[in-house]
UniProtKB/Swiss-Prot annotation:
The gene is rimP. GO terms for cellular component: cytosol. This is Ribosome maturation factor RimP. It is found in: Cytoplasm. It comes from Oleidesulfovibrio alaskensis (strain ATCC BAA-1058 / DSM 17464 / G20). Pfam families: DUF150_C (PF17384), RimP_N (PF02576). Belongs to the RimP family. Keywords: Cytoplasm, Ribosome biogenesis. Required for maturation of 30S ribosomal subunits.
């Protein structure tokens, strides 16, 4: 069975379980090899609690046992995506326009030869195309540049939370 097929089958099983608790699937990572890891991120309008993660984990675990699509032993992890949440789609990226993010591309792009990792502020997102106002490299010039890319070029993406912006604020 291909990874894509397993990924699709996992989504078919876990999505209804998560929705039954009025939560949404934020994203999923399935890492094979050695002891496989199925990492599921869930979210809700008011975030999620540890108890909700534990309950969803138990129900997903039971559903996966019945379907038996993961060969061999695996670890199941269910959690909130957190403040520095991974991003799994251009639509998720679009919701964070103006926020800082870190992206790793699958391959260096022609625009920045030899470079795959970028940190900067999310710019415009139109469909699967997006821009990122790149932070200047340390030791380089201070020119701010813009990366233009397609979501399919992204290997990994996550938000970067600015903890300094919270200093001095009353809670």
């Amino acid at each position: 069975m291909t990874v894509t097929t397993i990924h699709e089958q996992l989504l078919e099983i876990i999505t209804p379980v998560i929705r039954s608790f009025d939560l949404e699937l934020w994203g999923m990572d399935f890492i094979q090899g050695g002891k496989a890891v199925l990492r599921i991120y869930i979210d809700g309008p008011d975030g999620v609690t540890i108890d909700q993660c534990a309950t969803v984990s138990r129900h997903i675990g039971l559903a996966l046992e019945v379907e038996d699509i993961i060969a061999g032993a695996y670890n199941l992890e269910v959690s909130s995506p957190g403040l520095e949440r991974p991003l799994f789609s251009a639509a998720q990226l679009a919701a964070y326009k103006g926020h800082k993010a870190e992206l790793v591309l699958r391959a260096p792009c022609a625009q920045f030869p030899g470079r795959k990792k970028f940190t900067g502020v999310v710019g415009n997102v139109e469909g699967e195309n997006f821009t990122l106002q790149i932070d200047p490299l340390k030791g380089g010039d201070n020119l701010q540049e813009e990366l233009s890319a397609h979501w399919d070029d992204v290997k990994k993406a996550r938000l970067i939370y600015d903890f300094d912006s919270e200093k001095g604020q009353k809670r």
